[in-house]
Amino acid sequence: MIKFKQIRDKNDIYGMPILGTIFKNQIFIRVIQVLTLSLFLYGVYMGFAEPTPENTFTRYLFWGFFWSLFIVVTLTSFGRIFCGICPHGFLGKYITRFGLKKDMPNFLKNRFIGIFLLFFGWWAIYYAVPGFWKVPLATAWLFASLTIFAFIMYYLYKDMSYCKYMCPIGTLMKSYSKISPTFLNTYKDDCKDCRTFECATACPYNLKPFTFNKKNSMEDCTLCMDCSSACDAVAFSIVKPSKTLFEKFKFQKAEVWAFILITAAISMTMGFHHGLGRTAIVDDFIWSKTAVFAQQYIDFGTLSAQGIFAFTYAVLLSIIIVYIGMYIASKFLNESFEKTFYTLGYAFAPLFVIGGLAHLISAFTTHNYADIVNGFIYGFGLNIEHVNDLASRRDSWLIYLKVIPYLAVLWGYLILVNRLKLFKASKIRKLFAFIFASSLVTFYLSLQVYTGYVFKTYGAKKSSHSHHSKTIKH
């Protein structure tokens, strides 16, 4: 055990004046955890106490501030630090400590559970029932139910198994954190004679930080930083972005499927429904025509037929394109389909989390900033002026954000090139494998280009993408 390490590498965040305090000082971390928990509980309470649309605090706390602003921004910068301050994980460590500490049954040790909860429980409902999650009461019930369920799991099972397997965003956070330019590890020279393993003992997830470098993986680390308070030989290093994805590591099937399904549910579906759906020829697209046809025979009521079919087509097309592309790529590489699929599928990581930054920045400056701040003003009854948007949709500088999705495409291609190095095949075979294995990246690129072409050629649909009123009543 190292009690105090005086000299740290230049890229070690723990050795940096301000960031070192933010990420290593346990008092500071605990304050942030308590504040996050307090906001979470108050947001749920407000959803029950004031379930009407006037309560903008609950809506924009969960669906503006936590998701997607804080989570996406931190995932691409420092990694899954939201998990380190998550109210469920924060309280879960203490519940587990006094719980039954049973092994989670194998049928529950399935990371696809969390992915499907997110995919169907959030995104499918988001498109099928527009505005459902905007209702404060629905949001309150969702997070109250998840909290009760999580606490039961923490009490029953050891090693924070709920976070690993059943949390709706657990696998998503673990997968996309590989994009970030940070990596938790240890100083090898300090660890070589260690026999007490305080960093591993302190970890509530039963992980061994001293093995992360060798495995080229932080596994299920949530950056709670408990290990760094137990031993000063732990480092939180700034590394090359996507460093892990450029090298060999043990793949996990659920991670690749998280990339595929989230890209399909967010990037592709929004490209169909919110992108092309705002063009003058929206009625000519297959999901629109299918919706019109289905409505002749089915009463959708309050459901959005267009949203349902845009989501369905985007998901099916994405999966089919990936399967066909990877199958052909496996033939060129003379490798099994499984190895090809799950080794090269990590190239899809940047599409949503990097490409989505363009929409995130645009949305934040043109309405989410005001929504979030005014929501907090309402929630805490502050007697101050409501704020206005930081920018207008007509501001010329917003056009420069359109380059970000193309950077995500280049990033995905670069990851794929490096992961193809893990296969033994001739250069010409790898070239053809690259063309087909990158099918989802190319599909994403094509959607960006085509959407721009349609807007330029046919223009926007009248009254498209109008934003809700900013009037907020106390």
Explain the meaning of each model-derived region.
Residues 226-248:
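Juxtamembrane amphipathic/hinge helix adjacent to a transmembrane helix
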Residues 213-221:
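Short linker/helix segments within small regulatory modules
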Residues 169, 221-224:
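Hydrophobic core positions of alpha-helical segments in small-molecule transporters
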